[in-house]
Amino acid sequence: MDLLFGRRKTPEELLRQNQRALNRAMRELDRERQKLETQEKKIIADIKKMAKQGQMDAVRIMAKDLVRTRRYVRKFVLMRANIQAVSLKIQTLKSNNSMAQAMKGVTKAMGTMNRQLKLPQIQKIMMEFERQAEIMDMKEEMMNDAIDDAMGDEEDEEESDAVVSQVLDELGLSLTDELSNLPSTGGSLSVAAGGKKAEATASALADADADLEERLKNLRRD
């Protein structure tokens, strides 16, 4: 019967049913073979007993029974081997069917994913990602520039002072010494005198710068 509870059996159910029938047949063949092997041993024992008693006619008849019994044992062994081969084929069919069902499910899932993954949308997402990344890079660069501008003036001034000090040290000069050589005046000055003092101070600074420049030129010529 290929119907189960009013519905048609699936291929998997039919395979399981046939597999159970084959296993049952192999068990029955094993039981019959064991009975024949037990009978074979009994016949051999009877043949030996009759031979000792000299009943050769009975021995000949029992020998024929022994031959038939051994032939049946070989047939049962062969039948069981054939049934086992069929059982293995059914098992292979079950495995192949299971693999086919699994592949069917995977194929269906792949189809669903392919339908969900729309290329234009993916391209749009990637373009938007690249745009946002560029904006982020630009903002980061602007922030770095702002930080450099805020910190750069102080660093540049310190670096410039360090360079001037190094040059003067190499020349054996001192900025403090140069400034101390400038002429200075004391006492209270009028507004006009203050103006003259400022002019004199500016002139003295200019002379000091000119003198320093002249020394640098002489060092270069040396």
Swiss-Prot record:
<dbReference type="GO" id="GO:0005643">
    <property type="term" value="C:nuclear pore"/>
</dbReference>
<dbReference type="GO" id="GO:1901673">
    <property type="term" value="P:regulation of mitotic spindle assembly"/>
</dbReference>
<feature type="coiled-coil region">
    <location>
        <begin position="12"/>
        <end position="53"/>
    </location>
</feature>
<keyword id="KW-0007">Acetylation</keyword>
<dbReference type="GO" id="GO:0005886">
    <property type="term" value="C:plasma membrane"/>
</dbReference>
<keyword id="KW-0967">Endosome</keyword>
<dbReference type="GO" id="GO:0046761">
    <property type="term" value="P:viral budding from plasma membrane"/>
</dbReference>
<comment type="subunit">
    <text>Probable core component of the endosomal sorting required for transport complex III (ESCRT-III). ESCRT-III components are thought to multimerize to form a flat lattice on the perimeter membrane of the endosome. Several assembly forms of ESCRT-III may exist that interact and act sequentially. In vitro, heteromerizes with CHMP3 (but not CHMP4) to form helical tubular structures that expose membrane-interacting sites on the outside whereas VPS4B can associate on the inside of the tubule. Interacts with CHMP1B, CHMP2B, CHMP3, CHMP4A, CHMP4B, CHMP4C and CHMP5.</text>
</comment>
<feature type="modified residue" description="N-acetylmethionine">
    <location>
        <position position="1"/>
    </location>
</feature>
<dbReference type="InterPro" id="IPR005024">
    <property type="entry name" value="Snf7_fam"/>
</dbReference>
<dbReference type="Pfam" id="PF03357">
    <property type="entry name" value="Snf7"/>
</dbReference>
<dbReference type="GO" id="GO:0051258">
    <property type="term" value="P:protein polymerization"/>
</dbReference>
<dbReference type="GO" id="GO:0031210">
    <property type="term" value="F:phosphatidylcholine binding"/>
</dbReference>
<keyword id="KW-0832">Ubl conjugation</keyword>
<dbReference type="GO" id="GO:0097352">
    <property type="term" value="P:autophagosome maturation"/>
</dbReference>
<dbReference type="GO" id="GO:1904930">
    <property type="term" value="C:amphisome membrane"/>
</dbReference>
<feature type="modified residue" description="Phosphoserine">
    <location>
        <position position="184"/>
    </location>
</feature>
<dbReference type="GO" id="GO:0061952">
    <property type="term" value="P:midbody abscission"/>
</dbReference>
<dbReference type="GO" id="GO:0005828">
    <property type="term" value="C:kinetochore microtubule"/>
</dbReference>
<dbReference type="GO" id="GO:1903723">
    <property type="term" value="P:negative regulation of centriole elongation"/>
</dbReference>
<dbReference type="GO" id="GO:0019904">
    <property type="term" value="F:protein domain specific binding"/>
</dbReference>
<feature type="compositionally biased region" description="Polar residues">
    <location>
        <begin position="179"/>
        <end position="188"/>
    </location>
</feature>
<feature type="region of interest" description="Interaction with VTA1">
    <location>
        <begin position="217"/>
        <end position="222"/>
    </location>
</feature>
<feature type="coiled-coil region">
    <location>
        <begin position="195"/>
        <end position="222"/>
    </location>
</feature>
<protein>
    <recommendedName>
        <fullName>Charged multivesicular body protein 2a</fullName>
    </recommendedName>
</protein>
<dbReference type="GO" id="GO:0010824">
    <property type="term" value="P:regulation of centrosome duplication"/>
</dbReference>
<dbReference type="GO" id="GO:0000421">
    <property type="term" value="C:autophagosome membrane"/>
</dbReference>
<keyword id="KW-0472">Membrane</keyword>
<dbReference type="GO" id="GO:1902774">
    <property type="term" value="P:late endosome to lysosome transport"/>
</dbReference>
<dbReference type="GO" id="GO:0051469">
    <property type="term" value="P:vesicle fusion with vacuole"/>
</dbReference>
<dbReference type="GO" id="GO:0000785">
    <property type="term" value="C:chromatin"/>
</dbReference>
<keyword id="KW-0963">Cytoplasm</keyword>
<keyword id="KW-0813">Transport</keyword>
<dbReference type="GO" id="GO:0006914">
    <property type="term" value="P:autophagy"/>
</dbReference>
<feature type="modified residue" description="Phosphothreonine">
    <location>
        <position position="185"/>
    </location>
</feature>
<dbReference type="GO" id="GO:0001778">
    <property type="term" value="P:plasma membrane repair"/>
</dbReference>
<dbReference type="GO" id="GO:0061763">
    <property type="term" value="P:multivesicular body-lysosome fusion"/>
</dbReference>
<dbReference type="GO" id="GO:0030117">
    <property type="term" value="C:membrane coat"/>
</dbReference>
<feature type="modified residue" description="Phosphoserine">
    <location>
        <position position="188"/>
    </location>
</feature>
<feature type="region of interest" description="Disordered">
    <location>
        <begin position="179"/>
        <end position="198"/>
    </location>
</feature>
<dbReference type="GO" id="GO:0015031">
    <property type="term" value="P:protein transport"/>
</dbReference>
<keyword id="KW-0597">Phosphoprotein</keyword>
